[in-house]
Each structure stands twice: as structure tokens, then as C-alpha cells.
Amino acid sequence: MSALRPPARGGLGLSRLGVRLAGSRRFQLIAERVPFLRRIGRREGEELFDIVAGFVHSQVLYALVELRVLHLVAEGPQTVQALAAATGLAPERMQLLLQGGAALKLLTRRRDGQFDLAVRGAAFLAVPGLEAMVGHHHVLYRDLADPVAFLKGETEPELARFWPYVFGAGGATDPEVTAKYSRLMTESQGLVAEDALRLVDLMGVRRLMDVGGGTGAFLAAVGRAYPLMELMLFDLPVVAEAAPQRLTEAGLAGRFTVHGGSFRDDPLPLGADAISLVRVLFDHSDETVKLLLHRVREALPAGGRVIVAEAMSGGARPHRETDTYMAFYTAAMRTGRVRSAAEIAELLTGQGFSEIKIFPGLRPYVASAVTAVRPSDAP
């Protein structure tokens, strides 16, 4: 194991000087007496405490979701007593929860003591899949109960069992678990599809194959946006079996084909001039991703495009949501990791793709995109 670097000698750079001053209790006390520095210090203090209290904030949200409190006040304000009776909580415990929800701006406390839905709470309910994601976070919370043991690899995360497909076709055999996974993917995929289609122009694509397409949520969005495009879906058979009904209900009958298989074991179907990988790469290790991209290159004709769309790390400039929440979430799945756009571009280059383009996400925690082309001289 390499030794830690000794403290640098000589003068301090501006960034290190700032760190030294911020870590001085004496400087903190002086800063409290200087208006400009006081504002900076208090803002930093609030943000620091927000980090400290983050776990409790997420638990307040989880309780609101589990007890459906936001739904109960969606039609109008309610008293503490009425909400307590509806959820089985003692009034004083409901008051505790409602105060927390109001502090997080999910609820509004009225002058008469009743609680109403706030703008942020209404937005939370309207985001597809967000409530479902929070609803299964108790699994992630247990996996992170001992974060040091988790980081050392000394735990057996439960989250990996929630997402059966990450281990290949053999992992997705329980119909109940698969149905739960498919529902969550379908509910949350709509938001990703919206952002991906804003970022990447698919005009000119004749036939798109969505690999790991689940029940067809992304293809349904593509089909609506591009009415002349033919569609293909490839996923594990137990997952993809629900796709025909969904795509037919979306008005796409006659425009799609569904193919069951595992890219780990099977070549991808031929015939598409573009292949999309939406929230797929971050589920898998680098070696598995290399295999997948190799399969994609084999399935594409010369000039064919690959589109990668998912939440991505900020890389050299770490992103608050993706480099914390998404990074630890995928680590708990045991097989994947959140990658930066530059890392994805490097993986694509390594598999013979060219003309790589990076599209920073409008909402990076939802999706950014990277596209590439199979060159005409690719073997």
C-alpha cells in the first residue's frame, strides 16, 4: 500500500489557503464579525448541516411516501388529527412528520394549523417513477447502514437481488421480482426518454433497436416522436414478454418486433441502423460493457449509430446527484458503476467506434448522452 503524501512545503495556493482558513476556529469567530464573511460563513454552515441532516431528510420523505400523506393532502388541506387517524399514527407523531415535511417544502403549514400540499410536493407526485424509487429505498438504506463495511466490500447488498437482470438471464427468473423491476423501470423511464430525445436527434434513422428496452417505455416515446421509424426491442425474455402489449397500446402495432435474449450469451439481432442503450451501461462492469459494445458494433451496419443515455458522473467535476446517489446506488447493485461521458467515450473508442459526440444532460441526474458511429472500415 502506498504511503500518503507528506504535507507540501513552501507557500500555500489560494485553494489550500481557503481550506486552512475555513478549518481555523479563530478565523470562523473573526468572520462572524465581518458582514460579507458572515454571510459566506452562514451559507456554508447551512449547506454543511444539510449534508449532516441528509439521512433524516430522506427518511422524512420515505415516511411521507409510505403513509401516502402527499396524496391525502393533494385534494385540499387536512388537520393533524385527520391525517393521524388516516395513517394510524399518534397525533403527536403525525405532527412531527408534518413539520418535517413542511420544513422540506413538500408541505405547507397554514395559519389554522392544517397542512396542505406545497408546490414541491405536487412536483414530486408528478414526476414519473420518483415515488416508486423512494418506495424501495429501504433496501438501499439497509445496504448503506455500515458505509465503511460497504466500501470495503464486506457486506452482501440486498439491492442486487432487487434488480435481477444484472446477473444475466439466469438472474431474472422470479416472475414477482421481475414484475416489480419492470414496473419501476417503466414508471421511471419516461423522464429519461424525454431528456434523451431532447438531447439526441434521431432524424434519418430507419430502424432503431433498444437493447435492454424492458417493456418498451423508451421505444414508445421514440415511436410517438418519429412516426415513420421502425422499432426493435431486445431484452431478457422474462422482461421483454410484456413489451408487445405496451407497444401495441401505444399505437405502434405493425411497427415493432420484440427479441428475447441475453447479450452476454447471444449476438444481437441484425437489421437496425441505430441502437440505443438507455440506462444500461451503469448496471454493468467495464468488462461486461466492453462485451455489450462489441455486440452492438457487430449488429450495426457501416455508418450505424449507437446512442448511450443515462445518468453520468461529472468526472473531473463531480456532480452532486450522480457522484453521490447514483454512484452509491450502482455500487450496491455490485455489478456496475456510474461513468463519466469521457469514460463512456473511451469505451466506445476501444470497441472501434468513431465520431463520438457528448451531449451534457439538461438534468444530469436524469440523463446525459453519448453517441458514436460504426466506421465503414470497422472489422
From Swiss-Prot:
Q: Name one GO molecular function term.
A: protein dimerization activity
Organism field: Cereibacter sphaeroides (strain ATCC 17023 / DSM 158 / JCM 6121 / CCUG 31486 / LMG 2827 / NBRC 12203 / NCIMB 8253 / ATH 2.4.1.)
**Pfam family, any one:** Dimerisation
Q: What is this protein called?
A: Demethylspheroidene O-methyltransferase
Q: Which EC number(s) does UniProt give?
A: 2.1.1.210
Disulfide linkages recorded for this protein, renumbered to the chain, are none
Q: Name the domain of life.
A: Bacteria
Q: What does this protein do?
A: Methyltransferase that mediates the O-methylation of 1-hydroxy carotenoids. Converts hydroxyneurosporene to methoxyneurosporene or demethylspheroidene to spheroidene. Also able to produce spirilloxanthin.
Asked if the keyword ATP-binding belongs to this entry, the reply reads no
Q: Give the pathway annotation.
A: Carotenoid biosynthesis; spheroidene biosynthesis
Catalysed reaction, written as an equation: demethylspheroidene + S-adenosyl-L-methionine = spheroidene + S-adenosyl-L-homocysteine + H(+)
SUPFAM superfamilies attached here?
Answer: S-adenosyl-L-methionine-dependent methyltransferases, Winged helix' DNA-binding domain
Q: Which InterPro entries match?
A: COMT-like, O_MeTrfase_dom, Plant_O-MeTrfase_dimerisation, SAM-dependent_MTases_sf, WH-like_DNA-bd_sf, WH_DNA-bd_sf
Q: Which residues form a coiled coil?
A: none
GO-annotated biological processes: carotenoid biosynthetic process; chlorophyll biosynthetic process; methylation; photosynthesis
Q: Which gene encodes it?
A: crtF
Name the family. Answer: Belongs to the class I-like SAM-binding methyltransferase superfamily. Cation-independent O-methyltransferase family.
Query: Which positions bind S-adenosyl-L-methionine?
Result: D235, R279
Q: Which UniProt keywords apply?
A: Carotenoid biosynthesis, Chlorophyll biosynthesis, Methyltransferase, Photosynthesis, S-adenosyl-L-methionine, Transferase
